């Protein structure tokens, strides 16, 4: 035990510190969409390597932190990440060397506020270094910190956030099974139709329930519309071009749940991504935009009515981005009306930005 303790800790002037950052490396890798993204390695004073890669979205909010791209159209159609990778090597690596890997807040603040330092009206925006460079390093540091404290990553993150660590609730996966919006070449404006196996007794059982329902849905789509209906969209959900609207989609999902034998165990979540079909000139939402039509143009109140009707008819427990990213007023109205029954999520609205979160709370 003593040798292990000596390996894990370093004593400096009577205080015990954990492993420190010896080197940070980064590289360009390819994500699930075939686009470049950033992967970072944090190498500690113990010689251990901790790795993390960052995701990116097909439809992103205008207030999200800057994802630094090369904009060289001759390479990856402008989506290369070599600038972000270089920033890890030349800016982050020398500045973070020697810092205790458990000093997550200190490291994050140093990257965002000191090394990058760029701000917009909503706060720190990471335009110099790039959010993709900063996040890759931050995630890798978190893994190093968890290892240094000999804790599972989820426990370590809860500790950093000041949350209770004596009890944990197993998260319920939200499984994207039908794609629309910017994720699929069909007429559906709602971007993600997800299932949540809330009746499962373990995470592994939840994944099994989700998988079985997904495959029953595949069989159902093929039998109703033919093989082309089982083509998948940007995030792995089916992008069946034959499906006309959200009601037909939800009926298919309910039938797949019933056929899989999991009725009563599954709730439904929607990621509407409403900014994608919002018209800023009229202040209205066009649910027939992808068809090039205007027969389903709605006000925010009418759209709220639609959500309320769907939540009454189907077991919908979560709705993400139901309105445009600047439509705070509609979020307020919908929360008052449906908030006790449905979880209302602001992704493009809040973009994990402290100032926007504060505005949302107020």
Named regions from a protein language model:
Residues 63, 162-164, 168-233:
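Mobile "lid/hinge" segments at catalytic clefts and subdomain interfaces of large enzymes
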Residues 1-20:
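N-terminal mitochondrial targeting presequence
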Residues 229, 246-362:
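Catalytic core of soluble alpha/beta enzymes
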Residues 31-32, 122-141, 173-185, 232-233:
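Glycine/serine-rich anion-binding loops at beta->alpha junctions
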Residues 55-151, 160, 207:
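Metal- or metallocofactor-binding catalytic centers and their adjacent structured scaffolds
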Residues 19-62:
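Structured beta-strand/loop patches that form or line metal/cofactor-binding pockets in enzymes
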Residues 102-107, 126, 153-154, 219-237, ...:
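Flexible, glycine/charged-enriched surface loops at secondary-structure junctions
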């Amino acid at each position: 035990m003593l040798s292990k303790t000596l390996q894990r800790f370093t004593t400096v002037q009577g205080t015990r510190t954990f492993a420190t950052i010896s080197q940070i490396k980064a590289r360009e890798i390819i994500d699930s969409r075939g686009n470049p993204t950033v992967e970072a390695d944090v190498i500690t004073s113990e010689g251990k390597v901790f790795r993390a890669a960052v995701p990116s979205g097909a439809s992103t909010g205008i207030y999200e932190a800057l994802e630094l791209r090369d904009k060289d159209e001759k390479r990856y159609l402008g989506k290369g990440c070599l600038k972000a990778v270089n920033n890890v090597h030349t800016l982050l690596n020398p500045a973070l060397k020697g810092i205790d890997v458990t000093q997550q807040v200190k490291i994050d603040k140093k990257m965002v506020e000191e090394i990058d330092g760029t701000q917009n009206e909503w706060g720190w925006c990471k335009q110099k270094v790039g959010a993709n460079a900063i996040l890759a390093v931050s995630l890798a540091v978190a893994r190093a910190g968890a290892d240094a404290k000999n804790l599972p990553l989820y426990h370590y993150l809860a500790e950093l956030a000041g949350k209770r660590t004596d009890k944990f609730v197993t998260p319920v996966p939200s499984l994207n099974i039908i794609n629309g919006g910017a994720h699929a070449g069909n007429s559906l404006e709602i971007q993600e139709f997800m299932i949540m196996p809330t009746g499962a007794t373990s995470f592994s059982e939840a994944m099994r329930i989700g998988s079985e329902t997904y495959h029953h849905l595949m069989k159902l789509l093929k039998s109703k519309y033919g093989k082309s209906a089982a083509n998948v969209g940007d995030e792995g959900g089916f992008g069946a071009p034959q499906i006309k609207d959200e009601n037909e989609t939800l009926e298919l999902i309910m039938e797949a749940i019933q056929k899989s034998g999991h009725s009563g165990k599954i709730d439904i979540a929607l990621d509407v991504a409403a900014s994608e079909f919002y018209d800023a000139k009229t202040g209205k939402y066009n649910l027939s935009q992808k068809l090039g039509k205007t027969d389903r143009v709605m006000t925010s109140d009418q759209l709220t009515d639609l959500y309320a009707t769907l939540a009454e008819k189907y077991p919908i427990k979560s709705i993400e981005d139901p309105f445009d990213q600047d439509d705070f007023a509609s979020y307020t109205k919908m929360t008052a009306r449906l908030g006790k029954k449905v979880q209302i999520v602001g992704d493009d609205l809040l973009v994990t930005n402290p100032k926007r979160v504060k505005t949302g709370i107020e």
